[in-house]
Amino acid sequence: EIDVSSGNLTLDVAGDIILDAAGGDIFLKEGGTHYGSIKRNNNDLQIHSETSDEDMLFVGNDGGSVITALTLDMSAAGAATFNSSVTENSDERLKSNITTIPDALSKVTEMRGVHYIRKDTGLKRTGLIAQELQKIAPELVSTGEDEMSTLSVSYANVVGYLIEAVKELSEKIAALEAK
């Protein structure tokens, strides 16, 4: 169906994909209900879930150096590769109840680094076992919403434990050297 007056082109007999020529947007529908959209906002690309304001992929320039060939490669096995770095907001203004990690050295000592073969890909990997880590530092482990409630590890957040453990070791070494 083509609606010349609005500039919209609807693909599919049921109208499940709508191309908005005026705004350059693509709207995804099912049975008349909007489920998502792909939008252009200035020079940014935004992929939205219409069912939640929190479900959005944003690709754009934040005012820093422009990456002319930004790549996100997602494999069928669920691996994601970026051609740049991934960062997480860590601004103090976003946090409350900030405390230093206590007994980090003893917790790091309990952690077991392992080599393993992924059953789904056959690839050799290095890391931690989520079930073991959950007993030591449960805040580093998340439970998936899949049928198996698969556990995942926030490896970036393990760094806080490692930093505090090194500081504890440094204090022990300094005390020994002072004797």
Regions found by a protein language model. Name each.
Residues 1-87, 93, 148-149, 169-172:
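Beta-strand-rich receptor-binding modules of extracellular spikes/adhesins
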Residues 38, 61, 85, 119-121, ...:
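Generic signature of intrinsically disordered, low-complexity segments enriched in small/polar residues
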Residues 61-64, 70-73, 100, 154-161:
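Short alpha-helix boundary/capping segments
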Residues 64, 131, 164:
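Short, electropositive, low-hydrophobicity segments enriched in small/polar residues
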Residues 80-155, 172-179:
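C-terminal intramolecular chaperone/autoprocessing and neck/assembly modules of extracellular spikes
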